[in-house]
Amino acid sequence: MSEVKRKLATILAADCVGFSKHMETQEEKTLLSLKDCRDIIDPVINKFSGRIFHTAGDSIIAEFDSPVRATNAAIEFQNVIKERNSLEQTNPKLNWRVGIHLDDIIIEGDNVYGNGVNIA
């Protein structure tokens, strides 16, 4: 068995608040809102040298080499989404909760594993 590759990294986990409830009542409009939010979040994560390594529905998990970069990315995309929500007239206003955690992680290919991912 090969040696496990580890490194210290900051994990950012973002999740849309009440996404399932929005989908129950306004499925298509909620999906459009989610796409709008991802069009905001993804480039901001990239701007701060983050790497999205997992998405599922309304959740995003990204790896950063710095807690400061992860925090700044979260603050920036939250502010832009807040502005988007203030202007949105027809589609649901989606809010995002974010967890950030610095820990030793296991890297296997493009995937990241470990307790640090779970905590974030």
Residue spans for each PLM region:
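Catalytic NTP-binding/metal-coordinating core of nucleotidyl cyclase/transferase enzymes
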Residues: M1-A73, N79-V80
